[in-house]
Amino acid sequence: MGSPLRFDGRVVLVTGAGAGLGRAYALAFAERGALVVVNDLGGDFKGVGKGSLAADKVVEEIRRRGGKAVANYDSVEEGEKVVKTALDAFGRIDVVVNNAGILRDRSFARISDEDWDIIHRVHLRGSFQVTRAAWEHMKKQKYGRIIMTSSASGIYGNFGQANYSAAKLGLLGLANSLAIEGRKSNIHCNTIAPNAGSRMTQTVMPEDLVEALKPEYVAPLVLWLCHESCEENGGLFEVGAGWIGKLRWERTLGAIVRQKNHPMTPEAVKANWKKICDFENASKPQSIQESTGSIIEVLSKIDSEGGVSANHTSRATSTATSGFAGAIGQKLPPFSYAYTELEAIMYALGVGASIKDPKDLKFIYEGSSDFSCLPTFGVIIGQKSMMGGGLAEIPGLSINFAKVLHGEQYLELYKPLPRAGKLKCEAVVADVLDKGSGVVIIMDVYSYSEKELICHNQFSLFLVGSGGFGGKRTSDKVKVAVAIPNRPPDAVLTDTTSLNQAALYRLSGDWNPLHIDPNFASLAGFDKPILHGLCTFGFSARRVLQQFADNDVSRFKAIKARFAKPVYPGQTLQTEMWKEGNRIHFQTKVQETGDIVISNAYVDLAPTSGTSAKTPSEGGKLQSTFVFEEIGRRLKDIGPEVVKKVNAVFEWHITKGGNIGAKWTIDLKSGSGKVYQGPAKGAADTTIILSDEDFMEVVLGKLDPQKAFFSGRLKARGNIMLSQKLQMILKDYAKL
């Protein structure tokens, strides 16, 4: 059974601990090392009277057994005072067991305002007050365990207990919300509905049954739910007589009873009543997101089908297998995506490129001599092809986008992305996998420039709750994630994301409101908008490229990553990297929490030698080559004269098709001057970037260099004023 569950050093507050269940909890916690605060007002089960005797007796009993405990005699309506006792005595608060309660049983017609109010004040408001007083302390220490006490009367209702039932079910709603709010701070909140003999149940249970339902048969569940190793959160449990059962909500598939552009009528409700109440193939929603998601799905069906009077969803089970199978191989409509340097720069800024790092300039300044698109900009191109609604139109796929998670991503580049261009994208459903709890749709997107394949994206999309249709679980078409090596990383780099990171990244085209709208994020179960997974993906890939390829985009071949947990803007990303040959394994963590957010990831790089897209020596016979060669020949005769006039070194970057095709240097500073292919051997005074075609236009006098500069066709850096002397060079010495 493993080692005993201990609570050494944990501070536990139990309300209503003077007798019955509360006493059993207090004794059990103390026996296992907890520091216990025994709260009890000292009144009877109707809430009448007060005194210190009940709490003192339990404290004394704990101390006799070698434990540590203090008493508190305040009403739970004064929660701050109750929690202060724990803080004053032990300096912290780890566990709150909201157990205090009273009864005022009356048939509904006989319940007075006082009967109603006092029940809610003690049970519901009292639990609220005590828990709220402990909440901030638990958040600061990143730990807390909370128990709310409901009852079978609250869950199912009971004659003569309308006031009590309402308060007890209210506690369940309170607990469910606290479970959601507290989980990021490691605060768990669960609800129990105990059946046990106590001061309260003596009035509603036979004496022999009260004796059989000992509090000691409930306490073990409470201790387990409050232990640091228990991950249960937001659960509801009935417990008694040594039996424990977990409860959950169940919902029929229901029926859509209205048509588009027609009023909904009670007659339609009546006609579909059997379907509405049919629990065959019932769903079991576990969150408000799942509940809301089904409503969104209904609205989509009404809008697309014009109205459904029958329960189409009920046919899903019998047709799911053939439906999903029919989706395999289906293609989305062809999609064209045009972009300029602006989109490439916007993306680079969105994934953390910055002027703080001079090496990033090539990704964020179009005038950089080696301006390049980050390789992972390719995911934006692939994603765009799926965002036009085509995915929802594929036969066999019924997609509720509120339940879609991005599971994994693969990107392969066949050549570096052009700095600007227009690509045609073709997307196809490569496979559909049944994972039980959901369906994985494998989408392949191929992007072409003319007929040349530029990149291949593979998106793994997980549809929550759509599994169990009997389909296959694996596929040879999936690009498989690979576990990281079992050794310390070879390199670790960190990036602190901005609070505006998601707002900036979404400008690249991912408009999902989950990443910007607090209300939408709340509906999805998050405290605030989260960062795009592909944004984190871009941060990590950029770091791998920088660390192991010196930002040479021509070496980037492929990347695969699995998305594990969300990131909040403002958190610090820690990319850990392992080099094994030309494969760089990596994982990404949130530094503040230690959570792994990208796992089983890798980047494949091309070998160092012979892999550049086109080096200067490979420039070949561009039109500009003849001009530079001619300038070189002329300098042999009149070089000293030109050097005296110019006294500068010019480095030229000649582009072709958006990429650098050749580099040339005209050295008019040393000796008799010289012209050679390649970058300047020393520091260049001026670097000039323009296309092969525009260079020829300048040489032929058809394009004024100044106008070319101000229109962006010619870019220069360094001592730009020296470029004015170029007209003399080109005009006088480059005539063909």
UniProtKB/Swiss-Prot annotation:
- UniProt GO cellular component terms: cytosol; membrane; peroxisomal matrix; peroxisomal membrane; peroxisome
Tell me the organism: Homo sapiens
Question: Which gene is annotated as encoding this protein in its UniProt record?
Answer: HSD17B4
Q: What is this protein called?
A: Peroxisomal multifunctional enzyme type 2
Q: Which residues bind substrate?
A: 151, 706, 724
Might you give the EC number(s) for this enzyme? 1.1.1.n12, 4.2.1.107, 4.2.1.119
Quaternary structure annotation from Swiss-Prot or TrEMBL:
Homodimer.
Tissue expression per record: Present in many tissues with highest concentrations in liver, heart, prostate and testis.
Q: Which disease is it linked to?
A: D-bifunctional protein deficiency: Disorder of peroxisomal fatty acid beta-oxidation.
One GO biological process this protein is involved in is:
very long-chain fatty-acyl-CoA metabolic process
Q: What is known to happen upon mutating residue 366 to A?
A: No hydratase activity
